[in-house]
Amino acid sequence: MKSPKPSHRRGEVWWVNLDPTVGTEVRKTRPAIIVSPSDMNAALPRVIIAPLTSKSHPLGCRPRVTFEKTDGFILLDQLRSVDKQRLVRPMGSIPEDHWLPVLLEMLS
């Protein structure tokens, strides 16, 4: 019997393998939040993610969050489209009201 496919829903945080990278792109396997719409994620083999970090300088495009008892930032300035094969395992989720308004402001 097949195990169910992961949901890949907007707001979920996953461990994501971001290597290989170029230049100043965020690298290594790290937590990242899925920011692409859930219906798009169900239809495509890719998702759009924003990496999370605990080591950063505050910027307007980097909302502060606490995830798994660690203070950090969502790097909305490092958005990437990644194949779902880069998603290692789910970790939890972050409510949209913590980050979506900042993303919408960036894209307007």
Language model features with spans:
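Conserved functional hotspots at enzyme active or ligand-binding sites that engage polyanionic ligands
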Residues: M1-S108
